[in-house]
Curated annotation (Swiss-Prot):
<dbReference type="InterPro" id="IPR018358">
    <property type="entry name" value="Disintegrin_CS"/>
</dbReference>
<dbReference type="GO" id="GO:0004222">
    <property type="term" value="F:metalloendopeptidase activity"/>
</dbReference>
<dbReference type="GO" id="GO:0046872">
    <property type="term" value="F:metal ion binding"/>
</dbReference>
<dbReference type="GO" id="GO:0043005">
    <property type="term" value="C:neuron projection"/>
</dbReference>
<feature type="glycosylation site" description="N-linked (GlcNAc...) asparagine">
    <location>
        <position position="441"/>
    </location>
</feature>
<feature type="disulfide bond">
    <location>
        <begin position="643"/>
        <end position="655"/>
    </location>
</feature>
<feature type="glycosylation site" description="N-linked (GlcNAc...) asparagine">
    <location>
        <position position="482"/>
    </location>
</feature>
<keyword id="KW-0482">Metalloprotease</keyword>
<dbReference type="Pfam" id="PF01421">
    <property type="entry name" value="Reprolysin"/>
</dbReference>
<feature type="binding site">
    <location>
        <position position="345"/>
    </location>
    <ligand>
        <name>Zn(2+)</name>
    </ligand>
</feature>
<feature type="disulfide bond">
    <location>
        <begin position="468"/>
        <end position="488"/>
    </location>
</feature>
<feature type="binding site" description="in inhibited form">
    <location>
        <position position="178"/>
    </location>
    <ligand>
        <name>Zn(2+)</name>
    </ligand>
</feature>
<dbReference type="Pfam" id="PF01562">
    <property type="entry name" value="Pep_M12B_propep"/>
</dbReference>
<dbReference type="Pfam" id="PF08516">
    <property type="entry name" value="ADAM_CR"/>
</dbReference>
<dbReference type="Pfam" id="PF00200">
    <property type="entry name" value="Disintegrin"/>
</dbReference>
<feature type="short sequence motif" description="Cysteine switch">
    <location>
        <begin position="176"/>
        <end position="183"/>
    </location>
</feature>
<dbReference type="InterPro" id="IPR001762">
    <property type="entry name" value="Disintegrin_dom"/>
</dbReference>
Length: 729
């Protein structure tokens, strides 16, 4: 039995579904974009070396422009670009969370002079949006109906880059579905139709302003943060890269998109991520309170959730109408330019744009508000009309020019968040009265050194070497306090690819293998099935055996990848472990019973039966993204020899030394740890030192004592004694 997601009570025919979609599209509503598979490329990437050339940019001073020559697709292309203005503040406010889930704001330096926009020489209406912040060119280039992504090759000594051609074939993507109920219609206090009636009375030619300025706040969920290897700097870079592309798409609308703040949920999701409609509603309420310190015209949340089967959702015409000025975008791990399309699309709904109809045209094969998600760069005439109707009627918040560095409001103390120039923040008056470490004015009390953190106890820094984060498994590493900070060092773990368990390898802090996954699903005693089970089932391409999906159908595994698709088990005694909506299948393969779980597309829950990344699939090979790849794809910047074989490499490619050896390379005697873990325990050092002195002394004393007692109590004879015979008397 196959699985179907039904629309309506019967949903018997495709025509009925089609009519329903057309009806939904004609109404103001919440709009969502259905999920697609991973990015499809027309061909393998080409290696190019951008050559800097003398600028011939049209109508501008050469000092303002950079020009590069790139050869790909059999042709030479000259790109002209210049630095963007108003894209991001130099010190953009970034809000994160401590391990106690206390909000913590920072103003890290984010370069604002390395994001570019421009055009391709000789290509009318071309689009270029590049970042050059990391020593190479990364971004999107669109021209002549094709979209290309470019990214630098890491550690290349010759400035090599990869150029990918994105597939513009819209038939690969299912149409967007509009989730509409009468209840959701009533939720919007002021609908698009009323905006239209009011705007139609206006004369657009007279009222069209010179420019619009959208101040955008972006929240990043834990899944998106994890996708960036839990690297805060990478998250910031990814967000700005996407906003740079979105800003370029909105330039024809005379609209600047400025990033005014980022919040990163680096300690777990604040809201449940199971239903995108609920996420949008919860986010709209949450941001009214928790994001109120960030001045913004719109707030969107970037998520990565396998529990959600759509790409995005937003309130129509929510701009300048809090709390409806928000949206959700679900990143699926594909090209950044496609994700930027999703963000631009959902922002379009925020601006009042609906999905394009057949009569709409943008002069390109892909339009931003198309009912199919394809690489796009332009808005249609319909989108322009919707944009004008909404912004001229309610877009007053878009008139003001962004204030550099003014993302957060002035008032900070008392909101429970430790921000710049604050020593602590105990919150309300009542909370501060109970706080032994912090005053109401956000300063520390006398004799208090800290008020929060894993290395703060009783308002004091914990001693140097105190354990603040213990090791939880063989692929994890411990951390210790340094005695001068309230924060525990960043959570570190064993470098990906280091052997663990029985023939397995550490990956992302876990030691995964097929046997363990079988036990997790079917209980104690279950183990991975024979190779025949994997070969027979995972080549079928159904819910019981596959190597991923393209968004609509299950994909058959290649023979080389069969151990990276679905996990198959044997020796199953407890068949009640899997919970709904999973179904079980058992088949016989060469006399062996193979058990596996079936998963239905569109159910909104992860597939527990998919083989986990990092699982061994052959000698020197692991599973990554449903592919069996060589361990060599992982970074080997640190080797056992690097650590003198007296330690293990960590996720930052530094040595974490065994006890008895000291970092950085475990060459000299010491107390273990790494340059990232904090100094190891002082107590342990003292104990070991004392024991090293006292144990030998005690051993000698005990030996002497035993010898003395033995002589006293055993009375060892010294030789025969003479006795005199007595004479008879």
């Amino acid at each position: 039995m196959e699985c179907f997601i039904m629309l309506g009570a019967d949903a018997r025919t495709l025509m009925r579904v089609t009519l329903l979609l057309l009806w939904l599209k004609a109404l103001p509503s919440l709009i969502d974009l259905s999920q697609t598979g991973s990015t499809q490329y027309l061909s393998s990437p080409e290696v190019v070396i951008p050559l800097k050339v003398t600028s011939r940019a049209r109508g501008a001073k050469n000092s303002e422009w950079l020009s590069y020559s790139l050869v790909f697709g059999g042709r030479r292309h000259v790109v002209h670009m210049r630095v963007k203005k108003l894209l991001v503040s130099t010190h953009i406010p970034v809000l994160t969370y401590t391990e106690e889930h206390t909000p913590l704001s920072d103003y890290p330096f984010v370069p604002s002079d390395c994001y570019y926009h421009g055009y391709v020489e000789g290509a009318l209406e071309s689009l270029v949006a590049f970042s050059a912040c990391n020593g190479g060119l990364q971004g999107v280039l669109q021209m002549n109906g094709f979209s290309y992504e470019i990214e630098p090759i890491k550690h290349s000594s010759t400035f090599e880059h990869l150029v990918y051609t994105l597939n513009n074939n819209k038939t690969q993507f299912p149409p967007m579905l509009c989730s509409l109920t009468e209840k959701r219609l009533l939720y919007q206090p002021f609908g698009v139709e009323e905006a239209k009636k009011s705007a139609m009375k206006q004369n657009y030619g007279k009222l069209w302003p010179h420019m619009w300025f959208l101040e955008l706040a972006v929240v990043v969920d834990y899944g998106f943060f994890t996708n960036a290897q839990q690297n805060l700097s990478k998250v910031r870079g990814d967000v700005v890269l996407v906003v740079n592309m979105v800003d370029s798409m909105y330039k024809p609308l005379d609209t600047y998109v400025t990033l005014v703040g980022i919040e990163i949920w680096n300690r777990g999701n604040v809201l449940p991520m199971e239903n995108i409609h609920q996420v949008l509603e919860d986010f709209s309420h949450w941001k009214q309170i928790s994001l109120s310190q960030v001045h913004h015209d719109a707030a969107h949340i970037f998520i990565r959730s396998s529990l959600i089967s759509v790409l995005g959702i937003a309130y129509i015409a929510g701009i300048c109408r809090p709390p409806l000025d928000c949206g959700v975008e679900n990143f699926q791990g594909d090209a950044w330019s496609l994700f930027a399309n999703t963000v631009a699309h959902e922002l379009g709904h925020t601006f009042g744009m609906k999905h394009d109809e057949e009569s709409c045209s943008c002069g390109k094969s892909g339009c931003v508000m198309s009912t199919f998600r394809v690489p796009a760069e332009r808005f249609t005439n319909c989108s322009y009309s919707d944009f004008m109707k909404t912004t001229l009627n309610q877009g007053t918040c878009l008139y003001n020019h962004p204030r550099p560095g003014a993302g957060f409001l002035v008032k900070r103390c008392g909101n429970g968040m430790v921000e710049s120039e604050e020593e602590c923040d105990c919150g309300s008056v009542q909370e501060c009265e109970q706080d032994p470490c912090c005053f109401l004015n956000c300063t520390l009390r006398p004799a208090a050194a800290c008020s929060f953190g894993l290395c703060c106890k009783d308002c004091k820094f914990m001693l140097l070497g105190e354990l603040c984060r213990p090791k939880i498994n063989e692929c994890d590493l411990p951390e210790w306090c340094n005695g001068t900070s309230h924060q525990c060092p960043e959570d570190g773990y064993v470098q990906d690819g280091v052997p663990c368990g029985a023939g397995a390898y550490c990956y992302q802090k876990q030691c995964n293998n097929h046997d363990q996954q079988c036990r997790e699903i079917f209980g104690k005693g279950a183990r991975s099935a024979s190779h025949n089970c994997y070969k027979e089932i995972n080549l079928q391409g159904n819910r019981f055996g596959h190597c991923g999906t393209d968004g609509t159908v299950f994909l058959k595994c290649r023979m080389s990848d069969v151990f990276c698709g679905k996990v198959h088990c044997e020796n199953v005694e407890d068949i009640h472990h899997p919970q709904a909506p999973y179904v079980l299948q058992n088949i016989y393969a060469n006399g062996i019973t193979c058990w596996s779980t079936g998963h239905c597309l569109g159910m909104g829950v992860p597939d527990v039966g998919e083989v986990k990344d990092g699982t061994t699939c052959g000698v020197g090979k692991i599973c990554l993204h449903k592919k069996c790849v060589s361990l060599s794809v992982l970074s080997n910047a640190c080797l056992p020899e690097t650590c003198n074989r007296k330690g293990v490499c960590n996720n930052k490619h530094h040595c974490h030394c065994d006890y008895g050896w000291s970092p950085p390379f475990c060459l000299h005697r010491g107390y273990g740890g790494s340059i990232d873990s904090g100094p190891t325990s002082q107590k342990r050092r003292v104990i070991i030192t004392v024991l090293s002195i006292t144990v030998p002394v005690l051993s000698i004393l005990i030996c002497l004592l035993i010898a003395g007692l033995y002589r006293i109590y055993c009375k060892i004879p010294s030789g025969p004694k003479e006795t005199k015979a007595s004479s008879p008397g």
